[in-house]
From Swiss-Prot:
Residues 50-423, 486-601 form a coiled coil. GO terms for molecular function: kinetochore adaptor activity. It comes from Schizosaccharomyces pombe (strain 972 / ATCC 24843) (Fission yeast). One of its GO terms (cellular component) is mitotic spindle pole body. It is found in: Nucleus. Belongs to the MAD1 family. It holds the Pfam family MAD. Residues 1-54 are annotated as: Disordered. InterPro entries: Mad1. Central component of the spindle assembly checkpoint. Has a role in the correct positioning of the septum. Required for anchoring mad2 to the nuclear periphery. Keywords: Cell cycle, Cell division, Coiled coil, Mitosis, Nucleus. The gene is mad1. Residues 1-15 have a biased composition (Polar residues). This is Spindle assembly checkpoint component mad1.
């Protein structure tokens, strides 16, 4: 069965009359569905007796006919598949031939490119070797220069202290030289004007000389003709005198020109010396700033040392006092331990009249209370340690602030911000207040604890026989103390948080002050990424290359024998080629990105069309669009719309022969391709149902 490939012009009119569009949907042409022939269900004409006798034979004949029909249908399908495979083979063969041709062309191009690249690589290798040799030589020279510079730097560092005095003297000399320079510049300008006038006079004198020489030649010629030699000798003598005077004038002018040129050189030397002295002055100022900062740091360290020394001398003036204090603390600790042991023994030696259960309960309760007391004491010790550390940190920060303020007052006397300083002082006062509150808190705690202990001891002495009441009283007091400790710890935590916030605000204010002082003291000369500098460098490099090329071309013009171009022109062309390659690479990247974006967007568009209209769109490389229906059971059948030739092709094997009527009615008469596609979808839906 031959495959159909029908082409329809969208604007042509068909000769046949259109069918009625209001007919029933079942009478519309069938598309993309295989018409399966129904098997012949007619039973063979046999006698009724034979039918009754052989029903099995009739059923077998019926099955045989069905099998024959199936076999024919399968043969037809096989033929159709064979034709399609042959067509695909032919297409693949054509594609293979075209690909082979392309491959040969590409191989030739690659061979040419490889040869050119190999030549370029060899040239580059040679250039690289030469450049590496040059680089090694330059590196050796630079290392030697660096060593020499290091020695010079060491010498300069040693001579810096001596040159500080010289700088002061040189400043005065500089001022004198500046005045001399201005005078010399004025003299130079005057002498230049005089020189120009003298040059003009010289040119006029040279013209006169030339005229006189011409006149002399004329006279010499006339001497030959005229016999009176005495008059000619007089004229010659006068001319010789004039020539000698002019030569003397010329020599004097040349001497004056030499003097002025030497003066000009001296002026340039003085300018260079002035620049050197200015750079030395700048370095001297930097060293002076460093000395000031070092002095401030030294003063700070000395104040810290003095404070530590005063503490040691005031509280503990001698090492004997330190040892005595240690012994005293050890004795107090031992006394307290003895007191605790005596109290424990008193508790253990209670009267025997008390029941055992109560004693055990009281002992357990007392142990619990003792553990709680120990925990509280440990917490108190920790808090005291934290407090001491915090006070030390605050003192250090204050000293740093004072040193910073002193530095600021010394360095920038005018640019001090009074508001910020007042704010810092207020914050410091707040910190002092919180510190006083923290110091007052443990004192009140100690007072409460001591008063409670005294009252407890009195009650113990008075009411030793009433241990149960004593324990309850102790428990109540302990609870009260715990509550007080919790309150005090909460207050202390709150105050510590406030201290931390104040310290952070002080740190931020310091940073702001430092930034302000840096901004006031620093001067931005040039940024790192300066586009104007980059442009100027590129421009300078291009100008150098062009000047080199120009000089080489001039040399070529002078030497007419040379046939080849200079290297500079080749370098410029190479640079242009590199720029073009960069542009091409950027454009290729851009095109690739646009292609990727277009593929993503086209996929979205195709999916939208597929979900809305039920047609799959495939964009071909030649610009045409392949349209296949989702409801068709045959994948090969599809429409191909070509925009350039404005044609619509049907590719594949449409099963319905009435498809031409559908195209006549919708495309030729109604001239709507969307209507035809909609009718097709309805027809395929009916068939599938």
């Amino acid at each position: 069965m031959s495959s159909k490939l029908t082409v329809y012009q969208a604007t042509t009119s068909m000769a046949d009359s259109p069918r009625d569009p209001f007919q029933s949907r079942s009478q519309l042409p069938r598309f993309l569905a295989t018409s399966v022939k129904k098997p012949n269900l007619k039973k063979p004409s046999v006698n009724s007796a034979n039918e009754t006798k052989n029903p099995k034979l009739a059923s077998l004949e019926f099955q045989l006919e069905n099998l024959k029909n199936d076999l024919k249908r399968k043969e037809l399908e096989f033929e159709r598949e064979q034709i399609e495979l042959q067509r695909k083979l032919a297409e693949e063969h054509e594609q293979k031939n075209s690909l082979q041709l392309r491959l040969t062309l590409v191989e030739k191009q690659l061979e040419e490119q490889s040869t050119s690249y190999q030549k370029e690589i060899e040239e580059v290798r040679n250039e690289k070797e030469a450049t590496q040799v040059k680089i090694h030589e330059l590196l050796d020279a630079k290392w030697k220069e660096i060593a020499e510079l290091k020695t010079q730097i060491e010498k300069n560092d040693q001579a810096l202290s001596e040159k500080n005095h010289e700088v002061m003297v040189s400043n005065q000399a500089l001022q004198m030289k500046d005045t001399n320079l201005t005078n010399l510049e004025k003299l130079f300008a005057d002498s230049r004007e005089q020189l120009e006038t003298k040059c003009k006079e010289l040119a006029a004198a040279e013209q006169q000389l030339q005229e006189l020489s011409v006149h002399n030649q004329q006279l010499e010629e006339s001497i030959k003709q005229v016999s009176s030699s005495i008059e000619l000798e007089k004229i010659n003598a006068e001319q010789r005198l004039q020539i000698s005077e002019l030569e003397k004038l010329k020599a004097a002018q040349e001497e004056r020109i030499e003097k002025l040129s030497s003066n000009n050189r001296n002026v340039e030397i003085l300018k260079e010396e002035k620049n050197d002295l200015e750079s030395k002055l700048y370095r001297f100022e930097e060293y002076r700033d460093k000395v000031a900062t070092l002095e401030l740091e030294n003063e700070k360290i000395q104040t810290e040392l003095n404070s530590w020394k005063s503490l040691i001398t005031n509280e503990l003036p001698t090492p004997e006092a330190v040892s005595n204090k240690l012994v005293f603390l050890q004795n107090t600790n031992a006394n307290l331990g003895e007191r605790v042991s005596s109290l424990e023994s008193q508790l253990s030696n209670k009267p025997a009249n008390q029941p055992l259960g109560a004693n055990e309960k009281d002992a357990a309760h007392i142990t619990e209370l003792e553990t709680k007391l120990k925990e509280l004491h440990e917490q108190n010790r920790r808090l005291q340690r934290q407090k001491s550390l915090a006070t030390q940190e605050i003192d250090l920060l204050r000293e740093n602030l004072k040193s910073y303020d002193d530095e600021e007052a010394i360095l920038s006397e005018k640019n001090t911000d009074m508001k910020k300083l007042e704010r810092i002082e207020g914050l410091v006062k707040l910190v002092d207040e919180y510190k006083l509150k923290l110091e007052s808190m443990p004192v009140s705690l100690d007072v409460d604890e001591t008063s409670d202990e005294v009252s407890l001891q009195k009650r113990r002495r008075k009411n030793e026989h009433k241990d149960a009441g004593y324990v309850t009283e102790l428990y109540r007091k302990n609870q009260h103390l715990l509550f007080q400790v919790k309150e005090k710890t909460n207050i202390e935590a709150f105050l510590r948080e406030q201290i931390i916030t104040l310290e952070s605000s002080i740190a931020t204010l310091r940073q702001e002050l430092a930034q302000v002082t840096e901004i006031n003291s620093c001067r931005v000369l040039q940024h790192r990424s300066n586009p104007t500098l980059k442009y100027e460098r590129i421009k300078a490099a291009q100008l150098e290359m062009l000047n080199a090329e120009n000089s080489a071309l001039k040399a070529l013009l002078e030497d007419k024998k040379v046939d080849c171009l200079p290297i500079q022109s080749f370098k410029i062309a190479e640079r242009k080629a590199l720029d073009l390659k960069k542009e091409v690479a950027e454009r290729e990247k851009r095109i690739q990105r646009l292609k990727e974006i277009f593929s993503v967007k086209s996929l979205e568009f195709r999916e939208a069309v597929f979900s809305l209209f039920g047609y799959k769109l495939d964009f071909m490389p030649n610009g045409s669009v392949r349209v296949t229906s989702t409801y068709s059971r045959e994948d090969n059948t599809a429409f191909i719309f070509d925009g350039e030739s404005s044609t619509m092709k049907l590719v594949g094997n449409p099963s319905g022969p009435e498809f031409e009527r559908l195209i006549r009615f919708w495309c030729d008469e109604r001239k709507t391709i969307p209507g035809m596609l909609a009718a097709l979808t309805l027809e395929l839906l009916d068939k599938n149902d």
